[in-house]
Amino acid sequence: MNREMLMLIDAISREKNVERDVVLGAVELALASATKKLYKGEVDIRVAMDPDTGAYETFRRWLVVPDEAGLQNPDAEELLTDARDELADIEEGDFIEKPVESVPIGRIGAMAAKQVIL
């Protein structure tokens, strides 16, 4: 499926005269959106797709916020002191990322990318 997705990305890019990276980014956003629906709350999801192979990884992210600010969105934020328990050199504004299960591309990626481009 990954190779087929890359062929579809190339076809949409040519058909709509849009740079390939823009279409690839749209597919990543579509997959992230589909993954978010698997979670309760306002989670932050990032998908990274290899532009050469079509392989992709999905990550759940937490924004590191200052302790005094408190957590406004516990599903997508982590306090600085707690974050430093995991990563000593992390700073405010950085993200903690942990891999999560990726949703299959299927039609979701293709259709959502097309909608973003249109």
Regions found by a protein language model. Name each.
Residues 1-118:
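Charged, low-complexity terminal tails
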